[in-house]
Curated annotation (Swiss-Prot):
Hydrolyzes ureidoacrylate to form aminoacrylate and carbamate. The carbamate hydrolyzes spontaneously, thereby releasing one of the nitrogen atoms of the pyrimidine ring as ammonia and one of its carbon atoms as CO2. InterPro entries: Isochorismatase-like_dom (IPR000868), Isochorismatase-like_hydrls (IPR050272), Isochorismatase-like_sf (IPR036380), RutB (IPR019916). Keywords: Hydrolase. PANTHER family: ISOCHORISMATASE-LIKE DOMAIN-CONTAINING PROTEIN, PEROXYUREIDOACRYLATE/UREIDOACRYLATE AMIDOHYDROLASE-RELATED. It comes from Escherichia coli (strain SE11). Induction: Up-regulated by the nitrogen regulatory protein C (NtrC also called GlnG) and repressed by RutR. SUPFAM superfamilies: Isochorismatase-like hydrolases. This is Ureidoacrylate amidohydrolase RutB. One of its GO terms (biological process) is uracil catabolic process. Belongs to the isochorismatase family. RutB subfamily.
Length: 230
């Protein structure tokens, strides 16, 4: 067991019965020329987030945590995105951007595309799990819940993009399913203005989970921390 300093209070968990969730670290969300950038969102400050996720993943893997990578997107025909009868059709900024810029049709968040791929710096390793997801929440229409329950995992540590959309949506759904969710704030990035990041973190630490940072997380997983707790 290890204790992680967090807001609003510390949380204790067993790393070997916990998972690090990396949400949508795709070119679409973190790279110039990707979907978010083309849709008018600022991705200029995502590089430190990528580096911090690398650090968190390395520490989590060494501590025996399961690493789960999400990729958001749909089939090449966008059947999985839903048609006009789906609210996703009307609210997805990727779909709206392609409708407004027909030359982008088939390029944004389509499985197999550069946009859909994880950024070059983040490479899943053997033993990691990579899951596609068709909506903001990683629990919707994916096997995430059954994967976690079959392994006795109840604690989830979140990183990725976007804090105020897919990260928060997945953590909230996990809360409703009795999972303990922690966000590493400097390993996440918002879609939109800075206040969106602050609002998402406020919601999480006040109502749905806990907030910490990468350095504190790595310190908690270090052998000396385990020795102190034991």
């Amino acid at each position: 067991m290890t204790t992680l300093t967090a807001r609003p209070e510390a949380i204790t968990f067993d790393p070997q019965q916990s998972a690090l969730i990396v949400v949508d670290m795709q070119n679409a969300y973190a790279t110039p020329g990707g979907y978010l950038d083309l849709a008018g969102f600022d991705v200029s400050t995502t590089r430190p987030v990528i580096a911090n996720i690398q650090t968190a993943v390395t520490a989590a893997r060494a501590a025996g945590m399961l690493i789960i990578w999400f990729q958001n997107g749909w089939d090449e025909q966008y059947v999985e995105a839903g048609g006009p009868g789906s609210p996703n059709f009307h609210k997805s900024n990727a779909l709206k951007t392609m409708r407004n810029q027909p030359q982008l049709q088939g390029k944004l968040l389509a499985k197999g595309s550069w946009d859909y791929q994880l950024v070059d710096e983040l490479v899943p390793q053997p033993g990691d799990i990579v899951l596609p997801k068709p909506r903001y929440s990683g629990f919707f229409n994916t096997p995430l819940d059954s994967i976690l329950r079959s392994r006795g995992i109840r604690h989830l540590v979140f990183t990725g993009i976007a804090t105020n959309v897919c990260v928060e949506s997945t953590l909230r759904d996990g809360f409703f399913l009795e999972y303990f969710g922690v966000v590493l704030e400097d390993a996440t990035h918002q879609a939109g203005p800075e206040f969106a990041q602050k609002a998402a973190l406020f919601n999480i630490e006040t109502f749905f989970g806990w907030v910490s940072d990468v350095e504190t997380f790595c310190d908690a997983l270090s052998p000396t921390s385990f020795a102190r707790i034991a």
